[in-house]
Amino acid sequence: MNTKGKVVGVNGNLVTIEVEGSVFMNEVLFVKTAGRNLKAEVIRIRGNEVDAQVFELTKGISVGDLVEFTDKLLTVELGPGLLTQVYDGLQNPLPELAIQCGFFLERGVYLRPLNKDKKWNFKKTSKVGDIVIAGDFLGFVIEGTVHHQIMIPFYKRDSYKIVEIVSDGDYSIDEQIAVIEDDSGMRHNITMSFHWPVKVPITNYKERLIPSEPMLTQTRIIDTFFPVAKGGTFCIPGPFGAGKTVLQQVTSRNADVDVVIIAACGERAGEVVETLKEFPELMDPKTGKSLMDRTCIICNTSSMPVAAREASVYTAITIGEYYRQMGLDILLLADSTSRWAQAMREMSGRLEEIPGEEAFPAYLESVIASFYERAGIVVLNNGDIGSVTVGGSVSPAGGNFEEPVTQATLKVVGAFHGLTRERSDARKFPAISPLESWSKYKGVIDQKKTEYARSFLVKGNEINQMMKVVGEEGISNDDFLIYLKSELLDSCYLQQNSFDSIDAAVSSERQNYMFDIVYNILKTNFEFSDKLQARDFINELRQNLLDMNLSSFKDHKFNKLEHALGELINFKKVI
């Protein structure tokens, strides 16, 4: 029999409950008020009193309201049908909620995440008599563009023998597809779906590997200078309006991955609506089908209850780990982890815990680290390799990278793509600062070449600061040429037009080719009689390179521009 209790105190979305029986941390409970059951989670236990955060508005909850505990952790349902869906933080399907509730969400309405009526064409890959363990494949169904493997539930701890398995055909997620037997002779029915607690990492794999293979984003500044590896982690901090969301959306469209999961936790509703409108219309360049076919969106906008923001981040990473277990490459984009941290700060304040820096909880770093640590590249039991790459945007107030959330994130990620107000105001997009950003991963271009090119950016910035004080006349022609070359590298290679059909996504082959051209210009010695002549020449090169960026790779126009560029360089270079 489930434990019962009653409300003895309410403070915002924190409810204090007096219990009659045993409870455990993170147990899910329902507060019964005004004929509705409001979902909540235990976050502190003190004697016979527990504190729970309610995932809904707590208006109307009063002292004496009854509470029922479920004896379960907060879980997600895993199975075919997750892709193309839009969920809230508690995995309620928003399109179905809209049909039931209209434009405004009602409290206490919880729907099943997966469609129980839809039939999936199951093809078995195992047979009666096979010995299986948790995470092993029984067969697969086609879900959009993905071979969705039907697995032994991850919570099964022993080895089992398959005693029954259905023939190929159409089945719903609740229909029995196999029966397995353990060593004691007990039989277990297997369906296509099962539940898993969101705060428990899925560890049904043989070993974790060190991320080494680059995950191509087709954004030049990232792939060349600040690469991200498959199974790695990266963060995108930046002030409001610097282009974090656009950069994440461009990455999700063009990244070299099988499944994209977007966790919009605490972002403005307008940006989420934009994603929901655009994604079904966009074509996946790899398959020619809608991008939505390989995407799952978990959205908890800033207008939704604060407590569910934390749940939305964990829901997203759990779904990502589930698809990783199929041997797929997953990209998870959390936008924005700052809002999630603010939700933690709010709850910590209500619990009257000792605050850390800027009133964030003292355990902020360990919570952020435990989230990013769930990324990784793993070898599965059958030898396949799957990965979850996690990218979180951070929204520090005023673009201050010294604030606690950014600093806690920097300690655990492998790449830092810092967006700056200075670059976004100058319309230099993506507004990633080439001087402040860094990456620990290997990219698509030789590191010695990229370090040489980056040295020009550093020198060019120093010379630019000098010119602000002494003017152009106060520096030598050689220094001025270094400055012009650094500006050429910035405008022709680092900057990219996300709204141009050709320049929006650049293949690794084209990146190598174009970088070699720019690298050749940086290494070539030129001689000019004055600064005006130098500026005119570099501007001519720059325009030529920009035209090449907007031309199809190696077509007639591209080759013509490249030939003209070569003649220009040969005309002015010092032999």
From Swiss-Prot:
Q: What's a Gene Ontology MF term here?
A: proton-transporting ATPase activity, rotational mechanism
Its Gene Ontology cellular component terms are: proton-transporting ATP synthase complex
Instruction: List the InterPro entries.
Output: ATP-synt_VA_C, ATP-synth_a_Xtn, ATP_synth_asu-like_sf, ATPase_F1/V1/A1_a/bsu_N, ATPase_F1/V1/A1_a/bsu_N_sf, ATPase_F1/V1/A1_a/bsu_nucl-bd, ATPase_F1/V1_b/a_C, P-loop_NTPase
Q: What is its EC number?
A: 7.1.2.2
Checking Pfam families in the record gives: ATP-synt_ab, ATP-synt_ab_N, ATP-synt_ab_Xtn, ATP-synt_VA_C
Q: Which residues bind ATP?
A: G238, P239, F240, G241, A242, G243, K244, T245
One GO BP: proton motive force-driven plasma membrane ATP synthesis
Enumerate the SUPFAM superfamilies for this protein: N-terminal domain of alpha and beta subunits of F1 ATP synthase (SSF50615), P-loop containing nucleoside triphosphate hydrolases (SSF52540)
Query: Reaction(s) catalyzed by this protein?
Result: ATP + H2O + 4 H(+)(in) = ADP + phosphate + 5 H(+)(out)
* Gene3D superfamilies assigned to the protein according to its UniProt record, in alphabetical order: 2.40.30.20, 2.40.50.100, Bovine Mitochondrial F1-atpase, Atp Synthase Beta Chain, Chain D, domain 3, P-loop containing nucleotide triphosphate hydrolases
Instruction: Report keywords, A-Z.
Output: ATP synthesis, ATP-binding, Hydrogen ion transport, Ion transport, Nucleotide-binding, Translocase, Transport
**What's the stated role of this polypeptide?**
Produces ATP from ADP in the presence of a proton gradient across the membrane. The V-type alpha chain is a catalytic subunit.
What family is reported? Answer: Belongs to the ATPase alpha/beta chains family.
Q: What is this protein called?
A: V-type ATP synthase alpha chain
At the highest ranks, the source species' classification is: Bacteria, Pseudomonadati, Spirochaetota, Spirochaetia, Spirochaetales
